[in-house]
């Protein structure tokens, strides 16, 4: 019996069903860990526990040569790029690593790198889930990274922070671009399957008309691609405007008075910015009410859209410059 390629609705439903079962496993793990270890330990090791259950799910299904529950639900099977035989053991292992382990490692290492850079640049210790600044053990690699970061200049550290932010945003952009391409040609729903060359064949023919379904998904892909390009243009335009605003601000700051009036000295001595640890100049308020220098909080929000003190979400557009603030 000749098997045809799985269509886009089958691939999407299969992935959604797998995510549903994985979410159920994570929920049960949440209850068990909270019952035996407490909420604090669960929050500390939440990502690692979820990774363990995701790996267990795919090792018991894909790695062992069986269908996942989602694949079984829509009657599709994995095949290699030739579409004549099942993927090899190496391909299945690579698929599991790229789909579960690699995103976890990238996210963890990028967060840790940002953590190190912000500590060195601003002197502010950031509390983040899974990262306690005083308790996590440094590996030999991160000791070397820490020494390299400490040897950088302040400008180099700020540039590296922006580079890390751009890389993380680029990964998210790549995922959305890949999803739009999937809607248009329907080959690979996940990036990991594209990298490993794993396709799907359906065991039995679907009842619907594939041509009508494909046309609707192609239209959805075109709309998604247009929206993504529009979003990219807006981001680039916003970045250019921020760069111009920073240049104007630096020029204005050089032209401003170097010494505050006498009646402000006693107050200004107490009003210091917690980012630069200097006298707060051109006070700017976040939506949560904390005050910083305009330049300091603008640079912070351009790399991390949250308040440095209370971690509340805060974009650069929501900052309020306080004129004539005493």
Curated annotation (Swiss-Prot):
UniProt xrefs under Gene3D superfamilies: Zinc/RING finger domain, C3HC4 (zinc finger)
Taxonomy, superkingdom: Eukaryota
Signal sequence bounds: none
Pfam families reported in the protein's UniProt record: Pex2_Pex12, zf-RING_2
Membrane topology: Multi-pass membrane protein
Ranges in the topological domain labelled Peroxisomal matrix: 1-7, 61-89, 186-216
Pathway assignment: Protein modification; protein ubiquitination
Bilayer-spanning residue ranges: 8-37, 39-60, 90-122, 148-185, 217-236
Cellular component aspect of the GO annotation: peroxisomal membrane
UniProt subcellular location: Peroxisome membrane
Keywords, alphabetical: Membrane, Metal-binding, Peroxisome, Peroxisome biogenesis, Protein transport, Transferase, Transmembrane, Transmembrane helix, Transport, Ubl conjugation pathway, Zinc, Zinc-finger
GO molecular function: transferase activity; zinc ion binding
All ranges on the Cytoplasmic side of the membrane: 38, 123-147, 237-326
InterPro entries, per the entry: PEX2/10 (IPR025654), Pex_N (IPR006845), Znf_RING (IPR001841), Znf_RING/FYVE/PHD (IPR013083), Znf_RING_CS (IPR017907)
Binding site for Zn(2+) 2: 288, 290, 307, 310
Protein's GO biological process: protein import into peroxisome matrix; protein ubiquitination
Reactions catalysed, as given in the entry: S-ubiquitinyl-[E2 ubiquitin-conjugating enzyme]-L-cysteine + [acceptor protein]-L-lysine = [E2 ubiquitin-conjugating enzyme]-L-cysteine + N(6)-ubiquitinyl-[acceptor protein]-L-lysine
Residue spans, zinc finger RING-type: 273-311
Domain notes: The three subunits of the retrotranslocation channel (PEX2, PEX10 and PEX12) coassemble in the membrane into a channel with an open 10 Angstrom pore. The RING-type zinc-fingers that catalyze PEX5 receptor ubiquitination are positioned above the pore on the cytosolic side of the complex.
Functional summary from the UniProt entry: E3 ubiquitin-protein ligase component of a retrotranslocation channel required for peroxisome organization by mediating export of the PEX5 receptor from peroxisomes to the cytosol, thereby promoting PEX5 recycling. The retrotranslocation channel is composed of PEX2, PEX10 and PEX12; each subunit contributing transmembrane segments that coassemble into an open channel that specifically allows the passage of PEX5 through the peroxisomal membrane. PEX10 also regulates PEX5 recycling by acting as a E3 ubiquitin-protein ligase.
UniProt xrefs under PANTHER family: PEROXISOME ASSEMBLY PROTEIN 10 (PTHR23350), PEROXISOME BIOGENESIS FACTOR 10 (PTHR23350:SF0)
Protein name in the entry: Peroxisome assembly protein 10-A
Organism field: Xenopus laevis
């Amino acid at each position: 019996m000749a098997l045809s390629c799985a269509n886009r609705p089958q691939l999407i439903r299969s992935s959604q069903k797998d995510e549903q079962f994985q979410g159920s496993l994570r929920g049960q793990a949440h209850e068990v860990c909270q019952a035996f270890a407490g909420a604090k330990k669960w929050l500390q090791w939440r990502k690692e526990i979820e990774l363990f259950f995701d790996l267990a799910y795919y090792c018991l299904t894909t790695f062992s040569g069986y269908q996942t529950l989602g694949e079984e639900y829509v009657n599709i099977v994995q095949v290699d790029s030739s579409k004549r035989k099942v993927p090899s053991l190496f391909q299945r292992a690579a698929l599991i690593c790229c789909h579960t382990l690699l995103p976890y490692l990238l996210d963890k290492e990028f967060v840790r790198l940002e953590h190190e850079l912000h500590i060195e640049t601003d002197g502010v210790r950031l509390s983040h889930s899974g990262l306690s600044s005083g308790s996590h053990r440094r590996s030999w690699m991160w000791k070397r990274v820490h020494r390299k970061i400490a040897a950088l200049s302040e400008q180099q550290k700020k540039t590296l922070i922006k580079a890390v932010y751009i890389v993380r945003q680029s990964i998210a952009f790549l995922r959305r671009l890949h999803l739009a391409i999937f809607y248009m040609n329907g080959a690979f729903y996940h990036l990991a399957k594209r990298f490993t060359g794993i396709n799907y064949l359906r065991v039995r023919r679907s009842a619907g008309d594939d041509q009508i379904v494909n046309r609707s998904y192609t239209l959805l892909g075109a709309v998604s691609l247009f929206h993504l390009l529009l979003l990219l243009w807006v981001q680039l335009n916003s970045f250019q405007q921020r760069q111009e605003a920073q240049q104007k601000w630096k020029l204005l700051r050089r032209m401003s008075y170097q010494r505050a009036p006498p009646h402000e000295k006693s107050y200004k001595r107490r009003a210091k910015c917690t980012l630069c640890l200097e006298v707060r100049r051109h006070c700017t308020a976040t939506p949560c009410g904390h005050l910083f220098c305009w330049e300091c909080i603008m640079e912070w929000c351009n790399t991390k859209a949250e308040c440095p003190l209370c971690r509340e979400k805060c974009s650069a557009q929501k900052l309020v410059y306080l004129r004539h603030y005493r």
